[in-house]
Structure formats: structure tokens, C-alpha cells
């Protein structure tokens, strides 16, 4: 039976084969940079344009039995820079593919990506700073204690490695300065 890590590695291999630029994000990235947390999903940001939709559709067809997705929703997600999901019913794992939106911050995520190692595979992941900023932007829309807790864990774990100048600059540009101050001053146990 496939596990979450097996599915992650399988997908990364296929994205590399089909030359689809990707970043691992979400709970896997949070667990790598901060405090681990259990989840039944895998999140990727993918850079794909409508003209290249056949690549992602071919990749999805190669996933194998047990995986389910809606091809129309995939195309719609690419057209509207949204997200689509793939489900693996045997394990209950959901894989979210977030289409990279236009804009400087979103482009920066790919320029500033980090290579992390999971198993024997090198995987492109969102940087710790961009993961924090993304979660704070989501909190600006709908406050989430889980996202704030994730940010606290990343900041506490990555203290010396964080590019604080970049965080401060982009917190201002993204209008999340108050959230950044809140998580920098927070005690993890207080959430």
C-alpha cells in the first residue's frame, strides 16, 4: 500500500519527467522548516500555462489506479490561477496543486526555492520566508490559528537562517506587518 511519502516522491518524479516547475509547500514544508504536524494532504505550487496544459494532463493520466481527479476542473484551475485536487482513495490522501499566480511575490517563490531531501530524492521546496509570508497573507483573508502556529514554529526553528530583511520588506508589501509582528513575539505554547 502506498504511503504519503511514496505518493509525494511519485508525483515529484512525474513533474520532473514532464518538466513542470513545482515547489513543495504546505504541511510537508512546514514540518521541514518548523514544528512537525500530521496531515493527510500534499501541497504543490506548479508553474503551468494554459498552452502547456497537456503536460499536466499526461502526468495525471500516468498516476495509476486509485487516483482520481476531474480533468475539467484541472483546466479551469489553470485558466483562473486557482487550485485543483487529486485524491488517492485507498489512503485518503489529497494532493493540492496550486497554479502559480502572476505577480512578483509568486515569481520570487520559484526564484528563491530551496532544495530539500526527502528519502533519497532532492525536492524543490518553497523557502521558509516565503512559506511564512504566504501563510500570513491567508491569515489576512481568514485568520487561522493553525497557520499562525506554523509561522511561529518556522520562526523559532529557523531563527538564525531566516532572511529577516526579506521578511520585513515583503510583509510590508503584502500588508501583513501586524501578523508578522504577532508571530515573531508569540510563544508557541500560547496558541
What are these regions (language model features)?
Residues 1-191:
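Compositionally biased terminal segments of proteins
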Amino acid at each position: 500500500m502506498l504511503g504519503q511519502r511514496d505518493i509525494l516522491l511519485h508525483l515529484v518524479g512525474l513533474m520532473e519527467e514532464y518538466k513542470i516547475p513545482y515547489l513543495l509547500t504546505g504541511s510537508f514544508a512546514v514540518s521541514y522548516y518548523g514544528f512537525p504536524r500530521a496531515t493527510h494532504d500534499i501541497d504543490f505550487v506548479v508553474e503551468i500555462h494554459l498552452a502547456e496544459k497537456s503536460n499536466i494532463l499526461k502526468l495525471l493520466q500516468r498516476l495509476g489506479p486509485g487516483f482520481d481527479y476531474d480533468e475539467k476542473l484541472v483546466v479551469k484551475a489553470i485558466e483562473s490561477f486557482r487550485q485543483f485536487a487529486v485524491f488517492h482513495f485507498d489512503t485518503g490522501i489529497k494532493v493540492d496543486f496550486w497554479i502559480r499566480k502572476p505577480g512578483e511575490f509568486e515569481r520570487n517563490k520559484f526564484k528563491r526555492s530551496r532544495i530539500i531531501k526527502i528519502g533519497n530524492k532532492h525536492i524543490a521546496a518553497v523557502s521558509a520566508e516565503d512559506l511564512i509570508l504566504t501563510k500570513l497573507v491567508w491569515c489576512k483573508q481568514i485568520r487561522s490559528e493553525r497557520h499562525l502556529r506554523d509561522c511561529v514554529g518556522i520562526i523559532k526553528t529557523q531563527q538564525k537562517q531566516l532572511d529577516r530583511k526579506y521578511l520585513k520588506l515583503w510583509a510590508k508589501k503584502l500588508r501583513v506587518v501586524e501578523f508578522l509582528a504577532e508571530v515573531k513575539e508569540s510563544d508557541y505554547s500560547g496558541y
